[in-house]
C-alpha cells in the first residue's frame, strides 16, 4: 500500500501543532473584555473534530443505519475504509506533522484564539442559551448532588449513539462518545464555576467533572490507538520498500513509522497527552505579554542606561553589563529582579506550550517577547532532507537541519547545566530526549507518561537514524544510555510505578489511568482482570458513569471482534444492568441485557420485571424486550415462576371444619398480579393457563379461595378457545399437545371447585339468615295483638320466600358439588393424557389437592343435606364414596372415614326419629 506523500517531515518529538494568534494588545480593557465574554465563548469554540480530525475522511462511512444489529459479526475491513493511501499515516506522529491539521494564524489574532482555547476542554457543546442557564440554575437549587443530576442523561445518550451506529462506523461512535462527555463537562464546569465554595454537594460535582474529563480523553485515546492497530492488522502482510543507502533522515524516519508500530503508537500516545495539555492551557491568553515592546530584559537595559548618566543616584547592586543571551551565565551576574521574574514566568509558559505540542506557538511567543534567538533554538529539531539528491528538472529547497545532531548535543548539555532555570532545562531536555532532566518538572501522571513516551520515541528515532543514515564523522555523540536504551511499553509503566513522587503514584492507581495504561499496552486480558478486581472489591461503590464506560468499552471490543474474558464481560454487564434497575432507567435495561448469554439474559430481565407492577409499564417493558430481540415468552414464564415459587410453604392438610377463607396477603397479591405478564401475548395463553393453575393449586391448598378466584379471573375467558384456534392456525393435524390438554382439564377442574365453593358460601349465608318468628308479649293489648298478627303474616311470607330461595340454592350447590366429586373421565384433578412430559411437582400437588379438597367437600355436602332434612340422600354418600368406579375412598384418611361414618350415623338417627328404618325406608311390619 502506498504510504508516501506526507509533505514536510516534522520532528519525532516536537509536533507542528496548530498555530494560535499573537496578541497585539494587552490592557486592562482587553482583560475585562476577555473575562466578560468567557461564558459566551464556551459554546463558540471551534469543535475539536474540525481542528484535529482523528477520523480522516477515508475512515468515515456515509451510511448510518437507523437500527443496529446487536449481535452482528464485525466486518473490520468496512470499519477502516479501503482508500488507496493508508489512513493511519495520514494521522501519524509528530514526525509527519502532527495528527492535527496545521493552521497558520495571523499574529494579530493570537490572543483571540487563546481566549477561545480557555474552553478548549469543553468541546462539541451547543451554543450558550437562556434555556441552558435556567436548567443549570434549577439543578443547582434543587438537587442534593447537582453533578449527578445534570449528568443523568448520559446513560440514555450513550445507548442512543450505540444503537445509531453500525459496526462499520465504530470509530465514529467512539468519537460521538467523546463529544457526549465533552458536552457534559461543559455543563458541569458551569455548575462548578457558579457554585458557592465549600458546599459539600458541589465538591461532588467537581469530582464528577474530573471523572467525565478522564472518560472523555480515554475515548480519544481509544479511537487513536485502535484505528492504527486495526489498520496495522489489515496491512501486516504488506511489503515495505527497502530504504535507499543514501536516504535522508526524513526518508529513514518515514520508513520507520511505516513499519514500526511501537514507534507509531508511542507517538500517538504523545499526541494524545499533548492534546489533553492543550485543552488545559486555560487562561494563557491573559499572560502571554511579558514586555511592553519587543525587547527582552528591558528593566535591566533601562537600569544600565541610567547608570551611564552622571546624575544617576540609584542602587549600585551588581547586574550584568552585557545583554547577549549568554551574558548572565558567562558573567555569572544577575538580571534586574523584574526581568528575572518575567524570565521565569516566560520559561514556564514556554514549557507549557511545548508540553502541549505547540512548538510554533512557543516560537512566536519568543519573538513577541524579543527573544528571537530563543525561537531559533527551538527550530533545530527538523529532520534533514535534500530532495535534489535524486535529481530532477527543478531545484527544490532543502528541508531541515543538517547539523541536527550537534544541535541536539548542545540541548542535552544545556539541560544538564544546573546554572539554568529548571523550566529552561526541561525545555531543552524535552528537545534532546534527556529524561532525567525532564522528569523534575513533571508533577502529574499525564506529565510523567508524556515525558517517558516522548523520550522513548525520540530515542528510537535517533537509534534508527544512527544506523541507517550515512553521516560525516562527528567528534561528539549523544550519551550511550540514551542511544542504547532498550525501550518497551511495559518498561515505561514499570518505571512509572517506581517513581518517588507521591502524587504520580496516587494517580497511577486511579481507575481511568489504569484503563489508559492497559489500552496503551494493548493488554485487553489485563484490563479485564482489573475490571474483575474492581467488581469483587467494591461492586456497589463503583461510580455509575465508570460502569457505563466499562460496559461500552467491552461492547467496543466485541464490535471489533476482539476477545475479552467472557466471565468478566458478563459480570460487568450484569453489574451495569443492576445499576440501571436501581436508578430506574427502565428504557435502557433491555438493550444491555441482550448482550448477555441467552439464559443469563432471560434470568436478568426476569429479575428486573419482578419489580414492575403497573400494567402499562409492564406492557412497555415487554415491547422494549421485543425490540432488543430478547426471548419474551421465556422471560415472562420465568418471572411468573420466580414469584410463585417464593412461597416455600408446603401443602397442609385442611381441618375438617367449614372455616372461612384465609386472608389474602401482600405476597399473595404479587402472585395474583404476576399472571398479567402472560396475557399480553395471545400466543402465551397455554402458558398462562399452566402458570395460573400452579398458583391456584397453592391457594386452594391454603384455603385461600378468594385469592384463587382472583387468579382465575385474570385468565381471559376465551383462553381455551384461543389455544384451540392457534393449534388450527399452525396446521396441526394431531390434537393439542398433552401438556396443553391436561392444563385445560385442570383449569376446568379448578373452575368447578371454585363454583361449588362459592355456591356453598351463598347457601351457608342464606341458611343462617332465616327470618325470625315474631313473639307475642305477655298480656298484650288489642292493638298489640293486631300488630302481632300482621307480623306473623309478614313472617310467613318472608319465610316462604326464604324457603324457596333455600331450596333453589340447595339444588344448585348439590349439583355443583356432585360435579366436583364425580368429575368426568377419571375424577377431579386427574390427568387424562398420560403421554405428557413428566412434572413430578405438579403430579404430587394434584394428588394432595384431591386428598385435601374432596373429603372436605364431601363433609360440606353432608352438612347441606342434613341441614335441609335430606337424610336419606345423606346415607347415599356412603355408596358414592365406596364406589369402585370413582374410588373416592382412596382420598380419605382413616380419621376422615371415621368422621364420615359418625355423620351418617347422625342422619340415620334422624330417620329413625321419623319412624323410618336406618336407611330411610318405611318399616315393613
From Swiss-Prot:
Quaternary organization: Part of the nuclear pore complex (NPC). Forms part of the Nup160 subcomplex in the nuclear pore which is composed of NUP160, NUP133, NUP107 and Nup96; this complex plays a role in RNA export and in tethering Nup98 and NUP153 to the nucleus. Does not interact with TPR. Interacts with ZNF106.
Keyword vocabulary terms for this entry: Acetylation, Centromere, Chromosome, Disease variant, Epilepsy, Intellectual disability, Kinetochore, Membrane, Methylation, mRNA transport, Nuclear pore complex, Nucleus, Phosphoprotein, Protein transport, Translocation, Transport
Residue positions, PTM Omega-N-methylarginine: 60, 68
Biased composition (Polar residues): 35-49, 55-66
Function: Plays a role in the nuclear pore complex (NPC) assembly and/or maintenance. Required for the assembly of peripheral proteins into the NPC. May anchor NUP62 to the NPC. Involved in nephrogenesis.
Residues recorded as bearing N-acetylmethionine in the entry: 1
GO MF annotation terms: structural constituent of nuclear pore
Protein name, UniProt field: Nuclear pore complex protein Nup107
Gene: NUP107
Modified residues (Phosphoserine): 4, 10-11, 37, 57-58, 69, 86
Amino acid at each position: 500500500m502506498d504510504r508516501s506523500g506526507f509533505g514536510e517531515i516534522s520532528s519525532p518529538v516536537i509536533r507542528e501543532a496548530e498555530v494560535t494568534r499573537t496578541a497585539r494588545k494587552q490592557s486592562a480593557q482587553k482583560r475585562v473584555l476577555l473575562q466578560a465574554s468567557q461564558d459566551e465563548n464556551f459554546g463558540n469554540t471551534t469543535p475539536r473534530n474540525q481542528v484535529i480530525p482523528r477520523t480522516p475522511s477515508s475512515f468515515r462511512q456515509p451510511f448510518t443505519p437507523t437500527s443496529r444489529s446487536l449481535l452482528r459479526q464485525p466486518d473490520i475491513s468496512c470499519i477502516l475504509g479501503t482508500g488507496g493511501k493508508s489512513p493511519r499515516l495520514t494521522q501519524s506522529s509528530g514526525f509527519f506533522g502532527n495528527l492535527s491539521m496545521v493552521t497558520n494564524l495571523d499574529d494579530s489574532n493570537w490572543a483571540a484564539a487563546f481566549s477561545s482555547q480557555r474552553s478548549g476542554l469543553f468541546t462539541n457543546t451547543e451554543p450558550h442559551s437562556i434555556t441552558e442557564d435556567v436548567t443549570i440554575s434549577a439543578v443547582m437549587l434543587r438537587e442534593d448532588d447537582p453533578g449527578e443530576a445534570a449528568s443523568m442523561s448520559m446513560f440514555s445518550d450513550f445507548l442512543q449513539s450505540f444503537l445509531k451506529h453500525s459496526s462499520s462506523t465504530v470509530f465514529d461512535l467512539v468519537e460521538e462518545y467523546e463529544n457526549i462527555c465533552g458536552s457534559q463537562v461543559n455543563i458541569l464546569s458551569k455548575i462548578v464555576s457558579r457554585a458557592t465554595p465549600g458546599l459539600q454537594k458541589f465538591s461532588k460535582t467537581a469530582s464528577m467533572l474530573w471523572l467525565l474529563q478522564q472518560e472523555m480523553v480515554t475515548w480519544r485515546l481509544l479511537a487513536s490507538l485502535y484505528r492504527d492497530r486495526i489498520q496495522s492488522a489489515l496491512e501486516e502482510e504488506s511489503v515495505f520498500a527497502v530504504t535507499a543507502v543514501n536516504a535522508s533522515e526524513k526518508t529513514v524516519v518515514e520508513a520507520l513509522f511505516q513499519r514500526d508500530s511501537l514507534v507509531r503508537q508511542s507517538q500517538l500516545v504523545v499526541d494524545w497527552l499533548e492534546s489533553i495539555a492543550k485543552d488545559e492551557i486555560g487562561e494563557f491568553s491573559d499572560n502571554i505579554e511579558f514586555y511592553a515592546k519587543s525587547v527582552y530584559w528591558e528593566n535591566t537595559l533601562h537600569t544600565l542606561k541610567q547608570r551611564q548618566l552622571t546624575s544617576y543616584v540609584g542602587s549600585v547592586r551588581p547586574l550584568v553589563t552585557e545583554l547577549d543571551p549568554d551574558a548572565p551565565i558567562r558573567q555569572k551576574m544577575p538580571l534586574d529582579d523584574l526581568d528575572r521574574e518575567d524570565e521565569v514566568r516566560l520559561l514556564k509558559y514556554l514549557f507549557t506550550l511545548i508540553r502541549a505540542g505547540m512548538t510554533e506557538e512557543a516560537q512566536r511567543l519568543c519573538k513577541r517577547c524579543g527573544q528571537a534567538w530563543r525561537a531559533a533554538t527551538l527550530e533545530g529539531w527538523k529532520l534533514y532532507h535534500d530532495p535534489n539528491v535524486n535529481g530532477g528538472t527543478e531545484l527544490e529547497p532543502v528541508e531541515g537541519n543538517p547539523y541536527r545532531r550537534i544541535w541536539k548535543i548542545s540541548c542535552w548539555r544545556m539541560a544538564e547545566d544546573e546554572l539554568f532555570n529548571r523550566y529552561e532545562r526541561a525545555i531543552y531536555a524535552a528537545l534532546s530526549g534527556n529524561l532525567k532532566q525532564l522528569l523534575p518538572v513533571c508533577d502529574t501522571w499525564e506529565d510523567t507518561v508524556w515525558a517517558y513516551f516522548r523520550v522513548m520515541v525520540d530515542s528510537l528515532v535517533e537509534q534508527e537514524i544512527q544506523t541507517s543514515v550515512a553521516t560525516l564523522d562527528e567528534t561528539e555523540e549523544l550519551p550511550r544510555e540514551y542511544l542504547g536504551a532498550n525501550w518497551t511499553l511495559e518498561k515505561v509503566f514499570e518505571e512509572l510505578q517506581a517513581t518517588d513522587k507521591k502524587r504520580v503514584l496516587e494517580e497511577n492507581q486511579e481507575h481511568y489511568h489504569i484503563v489508559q495504561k492497559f489500552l496503551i499496552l494493548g493488554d485487553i486480558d489485563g484490563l479485564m482482570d482489573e475490571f474483575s478486581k474492581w467488581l469483587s472489591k467494591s461492586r456497589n461503590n463503583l461510580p455509575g458513569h465508570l460502569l457505563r464506560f466499562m460496559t461500552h468499552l467491552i461492547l467496543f471490543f466485541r464490535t471489533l471482534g476482539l476477545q475479552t474474558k467472557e466471565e468478566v464481560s458478563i459480570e460487568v454487564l450484569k453489574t451495569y444492568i443492576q445499576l440501571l434497575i436501581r436508578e430506574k432507567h427502565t428504557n435502557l435495561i433491555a438493550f444491555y441485557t441482550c448482550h448477555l448469554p441467552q439464559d443469563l439474559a432471560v434470568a436478568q430481565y426476569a429479575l428486573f420485571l419482578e419489580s414492575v407492577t403497573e400494567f402499562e409499564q409492564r406492557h412497555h417493558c415487554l415491547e422494549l424486550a421485543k425490540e432488543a430481540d430478547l426471548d419474551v415468552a421465556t422471560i415472562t414464564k420465568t418471572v411468573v415462576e420466580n414469584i410463585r415459587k417464593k412461597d416455600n410453604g408446603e401443602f397442609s392438610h385442611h381441618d375438617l371444619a367449614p372455616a372461612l377463607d384465609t386472608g389474602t396477603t401482600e405476597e399473595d397479591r404479587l402472585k395474583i398480579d404476576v399472571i398479567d405478564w402472560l396475557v399480553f401475548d395471545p400466543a402465551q395463553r397455554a402458558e398462562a393457563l399452566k402458570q395460573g393453575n400452579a398458583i391456584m393449586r397453592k391457594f386452594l391448598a391454603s384455603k385461600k379461595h378468594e385469592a384463587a378466584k382472583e387468579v382465575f379471573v385474570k385468565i381471559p375467558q376465551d383462553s381455551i378457545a384461543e389455544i384451540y384456534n392457534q393449534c388450527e392456525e399452525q396446521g396441526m393435524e394431531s390434537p393439542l399437545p398433552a401438556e396443553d390438554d391436561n392444563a385445560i382439564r385442570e383449569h376446568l377442574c379448578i373452575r368447578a371447585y371454585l363454583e361449588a365453593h362459592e355456591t356453598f358460601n351463598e347457601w351457608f349465608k342464606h341458611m343462617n339468615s332465616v327470618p325470625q318468628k315474631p313473639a307475642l308479649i305477655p298480656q298484650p293489648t288489642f292493638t298489640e295483638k293486631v300488630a302481632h298478627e300482621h307480623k306473623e303474616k309478614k313472617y310467613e311470607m318472608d319465610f316462604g320466600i326464604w324457603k324457596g330461595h333455600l331450596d333453589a340454592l340447595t339444588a344448585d350447590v348439590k349439583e355443583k358439588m356432585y360435579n366436583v366429586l364425580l368429575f368426568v373421565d377419571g375424577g377431579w384433578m386427574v390427568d387424562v393424557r398420560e403421554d405428557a412430559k413428566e412434572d413430578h411437582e405438579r403430579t404430587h400437588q394434584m394428588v394432595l389437592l384431591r386428598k385435601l379438597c374432596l373429603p372436605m367437600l364431601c363433609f360440606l355436602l353432608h352438612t347441606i343435606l342434613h341441614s335441609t332434612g335430606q337424610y336419606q340422600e345423606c346415607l347415599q354418600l356412603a355408596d358414592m364414596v365406596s364406589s369402585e368406579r370413582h374410588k373416592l375412598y382412596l382420598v380419605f384418611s382413616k380419621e376422615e372415614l371415621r368422621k364420615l361414618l359418625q355423620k351418617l350415623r347422625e342422619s340415620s338417627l334422624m330417620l329413625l326419629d321419623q319412624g323410618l328404618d336406618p336407611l330411610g325406608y318405611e318399616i315393613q311390619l
